[in-house]
Amino acid sequence: MRRVEEFSRRLREGRDPAHDFSHIQRIARLCRAIAPPGVDTELVVLAAYFHGALEREDEVRRFLEELGVKEEYACRVLEAVRDAESGRPESPEGKVLYDANVLDALGAVGIARSFTKSGYESQSIEETMRIIRENVERTVYTPRAREMADDRRRFMKYFLERLEMELRYAENRRGRAVE
């Protein structure tokens, strides 16, 4: 797995900080945590390391071949990535990977990632809040992901309410900063 991690880390170079290798590591761990019985967990975890790298699919295929991964299995790994990234996964593996990615966009980590990406792209607080609201509403498919998402969504809603309250307070103080 170390070679897979090293390869995945190289694939992430130059990405915005919200989509760096630590994002991939969290997704891989979440895949293990939420995969229901009957899902090939090892396949989904392997697919997690190639999440967001479909533009380099040929390179990923060659890497898997060098590792000795059978072509049929490599195709299933890449199909799970494709399915998850379609936004409407159909396969059990695609649903697990999709859900893990959604979970990483929820809760405290999701808020931190949203502001990190927005700062990187010079977006406003209001634009970041819009993105966070969109993330709160994303669907998850697996039972364990639904349980985990509920708590993370509650936290995000509380955070947004609090942030909106503080921003309104600041605006009501005649344009002066809140002290």
Predicted features and spans:
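Divalent metal-dependent phosphate-bond-processing catalytic cores, especially two-metal-ion Mg2+/Mn2+ enzymes
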Residues: 10-38, 50, 88-179
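An active-site-proximal "capping" alpha-helix that borders the catalytic cofactor pocket
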Residues: 27, 32, 56-67
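His-Asp-centered metal-binding catalytic motifs of divalent-metal-dependent phosphohydrolases/nucleases
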Residues: 40-60, 77-87
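Short, structured loop/turn "capping" segments at alpha-beta junctions
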Residues: 71-74, 88-90
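Short alpha-helical hairpin
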Residues: 1-10
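Short, well-structured alpha-helical segments
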Residues: 5, 21-28, 41, 45, ...
